[in-house]
Design a protein with these regions (language model features):
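Class I S-adenosyl-L-methionine
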Residues: 6, 37, 42-44, 48-67, ...
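SAM cofactor-binding core of SAM-dependent methyltransferases
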Residues: 2-53, 71, 78
Length: 165
């Protein structure tokens, strides 16, 4: 199965799919930190998500007719509820709001471009935010405390994730 893991420079998910025998590739705007440049595409996901000629980080070129599965982790900086307060004049100057609003719109476009890719199986992960009202409700809500070590494990205890698929 041809698997594209979008917005993933760490290659953690990509490596697991490879371990299971799939032809998986990670894709991000930056070089990978996972140590497998032959499995990494440094490009905008929108340029390769519908298949075609791809160039891997190690400069190898190959053709992918179509992806069988796309899993995406688009940046949440402007999409999450944590970003919402930055769009309020009570806490942020107008010139910064304008810039953040443009960044939010671009982030929403990226999310929607991935959601509308020519692929039968698409999964998008993001925290609670604007997309569950601007797009639709998620198919699954993942509560991080299911995986937390303890209540003191703040990062893994409180940041609810949404899965669209």
């Amino acid at each position: 199965m041809n698997v594209l893991i979008a917005c993933e420079e760490s290659q953690r998910v990509c490596k697991e799919f490879r371990r299971k025998g799939h032809q998986a590739f990670s894709c991000d705007m930056v070089k990978c930190s996972g140590g497998k440049p032959e499995w990494h595409i440094v490009d905008d996901i929108r340029c390769i998500m519908n298949g075609g000629l791809i160039r891997l980080q190690n400069q190898t070129k190959m053709v992918v007719d179509k992806w069988d599965l796309i899993i995406a982790h688009p940046p949440c900086t402007y999409l999450s509820n944590a970003a919402t307060s930055r769009h309020s004049l009570t806490s942020t100057p107008l010139n910064k709001i304008n810039g953040r609003t443009l960044s939010r719109i671009e982030s929403m476009r990226l999310f929607m471009d991935i959601a509308m890719a020519n692929c039968n199986k698409i999964a998008i992960e993001n925290p609670v935010g604007i997309m569950n009202t601007a797009y639709r409700k998620p198919d699954q809500i993942i509560e991080p405390y299911y995986f937390a070590e303890s209540e003191d494990d703040f990062e893994n205890y409180t940041k609810k994730k949404l899965a669209y698929g």
